[in-house]
């Protein structure tokens, strides 16, 4: 007190002197070093200035000096001799490695000394001896390995001592034996492995003891002897294997932590002598046993946290722990909760029982103050009516990641204060909303059985909701955009007028949001897209059925490999048309309210069947087109003499069989791809039932694989046809039949590739950041998918019907314009030989010229049938382009007789030697008709003669015969 009075007197004199000087027009500035910032109260801040020594020129009345975060490496003797009134000295964050024994001499008023974050290797005991007023000493974050016995001699006023974050290997027992006034001791973050008995025997005033983050494996039973006033004990993050029974010698202990150790069991009555405990942290220990009575009768316990006791099976008894407010028991194998839990814990506010094996819930009716319940990741299967009855204070309820299948419709009836409800990742088929008038946030993600929508009007205060399906957001988005005016007035009145209501956020957040692939009203979107899809559907169904009917008609000739592939391609395209028809029908049935049926459609068998058909048909069509390209290449090479023409009927059949097997194998590949789309669920999650949808999904890899396979198929077709065109010369392509077939397949490949590119681009879009936004977003992706995906199935049969002479011949037979018979078969074979995918007739294997003279002889008796077959050939001639040619057989029949019906009983036309009987010339052996034998070179008189002959024959008039060479019909 005397020193304080002297100091106040000196300060008063200084102030009076300064005032007198000011009265005379002069000023006396306060003494301060130019390297520091000083204040009027005697504080000097010299931190972070890069100083290498203690600054000079400071006022003698400085009581606070901060020279931390500099580069001072040592303190010389008497460096602070001019600062007798210094009370707080901060030297942290320097590189101090040496402190002279006399460096701190003269600092008799020093109370706080901070030496942390330096390079000290031992406690500077000599320099600390004369600091009799020191109350707080920080030596943490150094490299201290030892503490001399006389380190703290003379520091009788010391209250707080920090020795943490050093390299101590043992508790400094001797240096601490005289610190009876010490209240807080920190020895954390060292290398201490053992605490012996009576280690803190003389620290009777100690209140806080931190020993965390050491390597303590063993604690003596009497190590805490003498700590009669200890309230906080921290033993976290050590290697303890046995429960520290020494804590029973701490009668005033209030906060205990020994989490993150290796303690395996907590004995019965473990805390029976620690009745004042308020908080216990026991988590992250491999507990296999917890005594039932371990936590009984802890009347002051407010928080109990036990986490990670993976072997714990029984719920601990909490009898007598009447003031518990927070209970955390997670990561155990507890299967049930005591029915009388709320009878003992009436003031409980927070319960966390997550990550256990709880199957049944008792009634929480007695826990009237409970505000937060966390029961996620358990085995709960149902919520009964009385489980949460009477819990009017409950605000947060987490029941996620359970197996809940049923919730009673009145289970939430009394939860008038509930604002957050998490029911995600369960198996709920319905969610009751009665009583949830105050709910702000609702999570229902992962309840895939929840297909029905929620009524937004039953949740008036809901602001955030997550649902399993985007369609269920349609009700909330629409509700938010069109609020009922009456309800709007009620809200405005409740919040006290428009100004107050404007401050309240009224935005509804619903996830996942509906969009182009999750429409709320119409599946097909705009009318332009809808009309286009309808047109594609009708054309695909009509023309593919027409191609199949004409190709497989019993009136037509036998199928060549090319026509067989045409039929299979039409079948695949027809299935695609069926897929589009299903979408158009669904759009019509769910007109304006697709959200009500979207979930049922996506998750039902109908979408799976339609998706299977779509993937199978599209993949098979792509692969068949590649096979058709290969077949055309082989056929043309054979005709050009590259591989030799097939002569025998057996070889022709073998060739047809090989292509049929190849088509079947490709069909099996397509079936496998369609099945994989169902297995991976890539066709799910979109009402289009296709593996092409917006955003990334688990099936994105499968989608990419499909696109790559289709790309390879188109690339193969393009390479095959490019090589074919390069090898064929202008003279060889001059044959109109050959050129027509090759050109037609080329057009098919070109158009199908063009239609495939947009679909493939949008399939890869999710892999490229920002692509969907750049090209128009999901709306554009959906439009492209709806139009370009089935467009090839629409155009392929149209090309075949409009540009294939083979189809015209089949169509005439389908209409009954032709009859079966030798010349009929001859005309059919010659017209359709080598037809592929709507190509012009090109002889692929020579089967078109397989009729012999015997066949003619049999047909000569039926002059009317021969005339009708010739008439069919003439119709083909007149309906074909000028560049195409008709059957060479009927061509020569017309030359010979003007009409085959006029031949009468002409004898066998061919001799055994292969010469024509009328001329004796060698019969033709080539499989190609010469240009002189085409209908283009025939005179119109011959054509008219055939017509006149047919007219005369029908009326029994005389006939006129002409004699021309008839070519030999080869096998």
From Swiss-Prot:
Organism name: Danio rerio
Disulphide linkage map: 32-38, 36-46, 342-367, 473-510, 607-689
Alphabetized Gene3D superfamilies for the sequence: Rhodopsin 7-helix transmembrane proteins (1.20.1070.10), Ribonuclease Inhibitor (3.80.10.10)
Protein name in UniProt: Leucine-rich repeat-containing G-protein coupled receptor 4
Placement of LRR repeats on the sequence: 58-82, 84-106, 107-130, 131-154, 156-178, 179-202, 204-226, 227-250, 251-273, 275-297, 299-321, 322-344, 345-366, 367-390, 391-414, 416-438
Record-annotated membrane-spanning stretches: 532-552, 564-584, 609-629, 659-679, 700-720, 745-765, 783-803
SUPFAM superfamilies in the cross-refs: Family A G protein-coupled receptor-like, L domain-like
Known role: Receptor for R-spondins that potentiates the canonical Wnt signaling pathway and is involved in the formation of various organs. Upon binding to R-spondins (RSPO1, RSPO2, RSPO3 or RSPO4), associates with phosphorylated LRP6 and frizzled receptors that are activated by extracellular Wnt receptors, triggering the canonical Wnt signaling pathway to increase expression of target genes. In contrast to classical G-protein coupled receptors, does not activate heterotrimeric G-proteins to transduce the signal.
UniProt topological domain (Extracellular) ranges: 22-531, 585-608, 680-699, 766-782
Record GO cellular component, one term: extracellular matrix
Domain LRRNT: 27-60
């Amino acid at each position: 007190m005397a020193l304080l009075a002297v100091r106040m007197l000196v300060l008063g004199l200084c102030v009076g002197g300064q005032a007198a000087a000011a009265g005379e027009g002069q000023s006396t500035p306060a003494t301060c070093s130019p390297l520091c910032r000083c204040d009027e109260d005697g504080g000097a801040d010299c931190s972070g200035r890069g100083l290498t020594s203690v600054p000079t020129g400071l006022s003698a009345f400085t009581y606070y000096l901060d020279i931390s975060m500099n580069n001072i490496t040592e303190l010389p003797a008497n460096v602070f001799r001019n600062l007798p009134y210094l009370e707080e000295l901060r030297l942290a964050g320097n590189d101090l490695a040496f402190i002279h024994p006399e460096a701190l001499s003269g600092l008799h008023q020093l109370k706080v000394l901070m030496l942390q974050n330096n390079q000290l290797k031992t406690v500077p005991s000599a320099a600390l001896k004369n600091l009799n007023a020191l109350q707080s000493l920080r030596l943490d974050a150094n490299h201290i390995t030892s503490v001399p016995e006389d380190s703290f001699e003379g520091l009788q006023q010391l209250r707080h001592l920090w020795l943490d974050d050093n390299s101590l290997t043992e508790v400094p027992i001797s240096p601490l034996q005289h610190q009876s006034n010490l209240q807080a001791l920190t020895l954390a973050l060292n290398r201490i492995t053992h605490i012996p008995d009576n280690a803190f025997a003389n620290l009777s005033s100690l209140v806080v003891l931190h020993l965390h983050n050491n390597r303590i494996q063993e604690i003596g039973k009497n190590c805490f002897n003498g700590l009669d006033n200890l309230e906080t004990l921290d033993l976290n993050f050590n290697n303890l294997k046995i429960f520290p029974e020494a804590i029973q010698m701490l009668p005033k202990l209030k906060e205990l932590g020994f989490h993150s150790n290796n303690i395996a069991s907590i004995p019965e009555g473990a805390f029976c002598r620690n009745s004042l405990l308020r908080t216990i942290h026991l988590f992250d220990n491999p507990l296999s046993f917890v005594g039932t009575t371990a936590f009984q009768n802890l009347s002051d316990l407010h928080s109990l946290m036990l986490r990670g006791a993976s072997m714990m099976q029984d719920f601990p008894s909490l009898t007598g722990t009447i003031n518990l407010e927070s209970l955390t028991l997670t990561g155990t194998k507890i299967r049930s909760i005591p029915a009388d839990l709320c009878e003992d814990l009436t003031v409980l506010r927070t319960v966390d029982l997550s990550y256990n094996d709880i199957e049944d819930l008792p009634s929480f009716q007695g826990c009237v103050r409970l505000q937060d319940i966390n029961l996620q990741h358990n085995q709960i299967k149902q919520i009964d009516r009385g489980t949460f009855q009477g819990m009017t204070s409950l605000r947060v309820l987490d029941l996620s990641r359970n197996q809940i299948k049923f919730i009673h419709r009145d289970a939430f009836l009394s939860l008038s204060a509930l604002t957050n409800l998490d029911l995600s990742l369960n198996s709920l088929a319905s969610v009751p909303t009665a009583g949830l008038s105050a709910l702000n946030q609702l999570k229902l993600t992962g309840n895939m059985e929840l297909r029905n929508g929620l009524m937004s009007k039953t949740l008036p205060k809901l602001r955030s909701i997550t649902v399993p399906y985007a369609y269920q957001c349609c009700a909330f988005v629409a509700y938010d955009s069109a609020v009922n005016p009456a309800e709007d007035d009620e809200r405005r009145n409740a919040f006290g007028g428009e100004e107050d209501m404007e401050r309240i956020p009224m935005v509804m957040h619903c996830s996942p949001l509906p969009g182009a692939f999750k429409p709320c009203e119409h599946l097909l979107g705009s009318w332009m897209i809808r009309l286009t899809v309808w047109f594609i559907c009708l054309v695909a169904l009509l023309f593919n059925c027409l191609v199949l009917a004409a190709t497989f008609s019993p009136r037509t000739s036998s199928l060549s490999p090319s026509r067989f592939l045409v039929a299979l391609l039409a079948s695949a395209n027809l299935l695609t048309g069926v897929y589009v028809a299903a979408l158009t029908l669904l759009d019509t049935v769910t007109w304006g309210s697709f959200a009500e049926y979207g979930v049922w459609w996506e998750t039902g068998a109908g979408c799976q069947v339609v998706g299977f058909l779509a993937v199978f048909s599209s993949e098979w069509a792509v692969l068949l087109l590649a096979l058709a390209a290969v077949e055309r290449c082989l056929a043309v090479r054979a005709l050009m003499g590259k591989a030799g023409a097939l002569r025998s009927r057996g070889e022709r059949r073998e060739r047809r069989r090989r292509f049929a097997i190849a088509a079947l194998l490709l069909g099996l590949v397509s079936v496998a791809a369609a099945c994989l789309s169902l297995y991976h669920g890539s066709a799910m999650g979109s009402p289009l039932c296709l593996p092409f949808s917006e955003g990334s999904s688990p099936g994105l890899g499968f989608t990419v694989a499909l696109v790559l396979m289709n790309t390879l198929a188109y690339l193969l077709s393009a390479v095959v046809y490019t090589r074919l065109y390069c090898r064929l010369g202008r003279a060889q392509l001059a044959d109109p039949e050959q050129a027509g077939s090759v050109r037609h397949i080329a057009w098919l490949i070109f158009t199908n590739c063009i239609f495939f590119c947009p679909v493939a681009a949008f399939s890869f879009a999710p892999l490229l950041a920002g692509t969907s936004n750049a090209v128009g977003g999901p709306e554009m992706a959906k439009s492209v998918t709806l139009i370009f995906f089935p467009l090839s199935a629409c155009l392929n049969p149209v090309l075949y019907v409009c540009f294939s002479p083979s189809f015209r011949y089949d169509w005439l037979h389908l209409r009954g314009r032709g009859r079966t018979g030798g010349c009929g078969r001859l005309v059919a074979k010659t017209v359709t030989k080598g037809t592929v995918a709507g190509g012009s007739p090109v002889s692929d294997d020579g089967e078109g010229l397989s009729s012999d003279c015997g066949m003619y002889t049999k047909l000569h008796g039926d002059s009317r049938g021969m005339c009708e077959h010739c008439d069919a050939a003439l119709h083909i001639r007149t309906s074909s382009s000028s560049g195409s040619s008709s059957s060479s057989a009927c061509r020569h029949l017309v030359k010979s007789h003007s009409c085959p019906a006029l031949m009468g009983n002409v004898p066998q036309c061919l001799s055994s030697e292969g010469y024509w009987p009328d001329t004796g010339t060698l019969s033709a052996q080539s499989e190609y008709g010469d240009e002189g034998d085409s209908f283009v070179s025939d005179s119109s008189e011959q054509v008219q003669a055939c017509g006149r002959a047919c007219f005369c024959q029908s009326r029994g008039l005389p006939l006129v015969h002409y004699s021309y060479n008839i070519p030999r019909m080869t096998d």
